[in-house]
UniProtKB/Swiss-Prot annotation:
PANTHER family: PEPTIDE CHAIN RELEASE FACTOR RF3
Gene Ontology CC terms: cytosol
Superkingdom as given in the UniProt entry: Bacteria
Protein name: Peptide chain release factor 3
Length: 526
């Protein structure tokens, strides 16, 4: 077995998806604790203690206690090497989140057991459906009062259209939370509160019929036996093939804050989640065990190092292996580049990568030449597909307090749009600059970063734009006519792609009827 194959088989690359405040960043902390990457998990928003969550590292994130930028963390667990991509969890950081989901092989969905399925979770699940990504589910916050577990699973099945197979089952909740029963292992793991910061030995009782269980939890033992009869009859058994197709999700219960149940999830991911998968390109399917290196960029992050105004492109390795100093072919611009200083990450702490395998994420220093979606190979000319731009849902006009800095403003906006922080549109008929985002917080981030990184003071004004669509037409003559007649609604985006800026949905629908040969697209491949 080649070194490459051994390394590929070890890798598990996943992201965590959840609604804001369901406990995603806490789980990230605890997962790293189990991977020995952190000795003491700093509870998130732990402002009093001055210990900030490891994965929230940009200034604004430190101020607000939210993870704005996707961080990457690699750690060993149970004989595997796990790559965890932390995704922005707050209301508004969705486009980055969407794109991160294109770089993973499986996802962990975290649900607040008091609330059930919430709208951001629904949106993110739609994105995972584009590639039928396998999903593992964690019902969190069992140390609080929760909804009925069977009802929670029914809701996941109905709303997200995925079958649920319980792997662990809760015994009580809130102040009466006693632990979980691991259905596949036939063992009860008992919970003790106040042990969230470190990994402690838990008491395990083997066998649901063990009299020790009655001694330990009293009448809860008999209740559990009755409940399990019902659960076994009413729920799906775990089916590995259905899981790999994205049709069924194994469900775990626990509390991330109490560091309870997190090891069960990790065991499940290592045992069941797929190793790095083949990837589609516009030429052929790329297999992870191919000899030659390939990879694609799914995110660009500015300012990872406050001492340098650098930008780092995050690349998923898809085949072959990266070695320090190797030559890569940057397909879009047709140039070869020598890469001697790629990085591996532990959220803001960076180390030089000497070698990286399929499933790993490496960072390339970017001086403005790399864009989201770029493919790198060892000479072959093809492009990985499936890293889209999503049409913004909110728009603002942006203008300067000091008109002499127009050049810096445009430079800053184009760089921020290449990085995916925001989208920028330049209308054909005016000198306006329009900024588009998927959520309000992105606008704040952009103004803050323009000031700190480009020394530009910008302000927003309202603008009557409802939505945007990228426009295409195979017939050049028809496209030119459309351009002439609709120029007041057309703009170029940060990559100079023609975009229709619609003041209302009615206007968009009328234009689509009037120009049937023009394609109005909601997403655009990079």
């Amino acid at each position: 077995m080649s070194d490459n194959k051994v390394e590929v088989d070890k890798r598990r690359t996943f992201a965590i998806i959840s609604h804001p405040d369901a406990g995603k960043t806490t789980i990230t902390e605890k997962v790293l604790l189990f991977g020995n990457a952190l000795q003491k998990a700093g509870t998130v928003k732990g402002k009093k203690s001055g210990q900030h969550a490891k994965s929230d590292w940009m200034e604004m994130e430190k101020d607000r206690g939210i993870s704005i930028t996707t961080s990457v963390m690699q750690f060993p667990y149970g004989g595997a090497l796990v790559n965890l991509l932390d995704t922005p969890g707050h209301e508004d950081f969705s486009e980055d989140t969407y794109r991160t989901l294109t770089a993973v092989d499986s996802c962990l969905m975290v649900i607040d057991s008091a609330k059930g399925v919430e709208d951001r979770t629904i949106k993110l699940m739609e994105v995972t459906r584009l590639r039928d990504t396998p999903i593992v589910t964690f019902m969190n916050k069992l140390d609080r009062d929760i909804r009925d577990p069977i009802e929670l699973m029914d809701e996941v099945e109905d709303v997200l259209n995925i079958a649920c197979a319980p792997i662990t089952w809760p015994i009580g909740s809130g102040k009466e939370f006693k632990g979980v029963y691991h259905i596949l292992r036939d063992e009860v793991v008992l919970y003790q509160s106040g042990m969230g910061h470190t990994i402690q030995e838990r008491r395990v009782i083997e066998g649901i019929d063990n009299p020790e269980l009655d001694k330990a939890i009293g009448s809860y033992a008999a209740d559990l036996r009755d409940e399990m009869e019902l659960v076994r009859g009413a729920s799906n058994e775990f089916d590995h093939q259905a899981f790999l197709k994205g049709e069924l999700t194994p469900v775990f219960f626990g509390t991330a804050l109490g560091n309870f149940g997190v090891d069960h999830i990790l065991d499940g991911i290592v045992e069941w989640a797929p190793k790095p998968l083949p990837r589609e390109s516009d030429a052929r399917m790329i297999m992870p065990d191919e000899e030659k290196f390939t990879g694609f960029v799914f995110k660009i992050q500015a300012n990872m190092d406050p001492k340098h105004r650098d930008r780092v492109a995050f690349m998923r390795v898809c085949s072959g292996r990266y070695e320090q100093g190797m030559k890569m072919h940057h397909v879009r611009i047709g140039k070869d580049v020598n890469v001697s200083d790629a990085l591996t990450f532990m959220a803001g702490d960076r180390e030089r990568a000497e070698v990286a395998y399929p499933g790993d994420i490496i960072g390339l220093h970017n001086h403005g030449t790399i864009r989201i979606g770029d493919t790198f190979t060892q000479g072959e000319k093809f492009r990985f597909t499936g890293v889209p731009n999503f049409a913004p849902e909110m728009f603002r006009r942006i203008r300067l307090r000091d008109p002499l800095k127009q050049k810096q403003l445009l430079k800053g906006l184009v760089q921020l749009s290449e990085e995916g922080a925001v989208q920028v549109f330049r209308p054909l008929d005016t000198n306006d600059l329009i900024v588009g985002a998927v959520g309000v917080l992105q606008f704040e981030v952009v103004v803050g970063r323009l000031k700190s990184e480009y020394n530009v003071e910008a302000i927003y004004e309202g603008i009557s734009v409802s939505t945007a669509r990228w426009v295409y037409c195979k017939d050049e003559r028809k496209l030119e006519e459309f351009r002439r007649k609709c120029s007041q609604n057309l703009a170029l985006d940060g990559g100079d792609n023609l975009t229709y800026i619609a003041p209302t949905m009615v206007n968009l629908n009328l234009s689509m009827e009037r120009y049937p040969d023009i394609e109005f697209a909601k997403t655009r491949e990079h």
